Amino acid sequence: MARTKQTARKSTGGKAPRKQLATKAARKSAPATGGVKKPHRFRPGTVALREIRKYQKSTELLIRKLPFQRLVREIAQDFKTDLRFQSSAVSALQEAAEAYLVGLFEDTNLCAIHAKRVTIMPKDIQLARRIRGERA
């Protein structure tokens, strides 16, 4: 129950306080939202930290295979039409792409921490790439 500011009042008689106690008891026994229980919510950041631990423990690929394969084929079409890929080649490309992204996000996080922030921003990614020498 939310706290409210209490002001001093004159007591008018013996019956008023008893009535007030009865209403308080009734308020406590019945939920304020009409019997509908609110779903449990974790504090901001708790779920994010849990997900970080979960994904740092795991080794499986995080990008879905078919969308990544479509992207690879779409990019390859710009260089040569009717290219064929072995499934192991697409898997190797996906492993390399995910390893690159994980490393980039690690460096990006360090840039954000260096700027005394916990939230990464596009400028952190740009700085990380610039320091790596990927982008002049």
Curated annotation (Swiss-Prot):
Transmembrane segments: none
Annotated site residues (Not N6-acetylated) in this chain: 37-38
Region (Disordered): 1-43
Pfam families per UniProt: Histone (PF00125)
Highest taxon of source: Eukaryota
InterPro entries: Histone-fold (IPR009072), Histone_H2A/H2B/H3 (IPR007125), Histone_H3/CENP-A (IPR000164)
Keyword Ligase tagged: no
A GO term, aspect molecular function: DNA binding
Major subcellular location class: nucleus
Residues with the Phosphothreonine modification: 12
Not N6-methylated, annotated site positions: 37-38
Subcellular location: Nucleus; Chromosome
Residues where N6-acetyllysine is found: 10, 15, 19, 24
GO cellular component, one term: nucleus
Residues modified as N6,N6-dimethyllysine: 5, 10, 28
The protein, known as: Histone H3.2
The species this protein was found in: Medicago sativa
Gene that produces this protein: H3-1.1
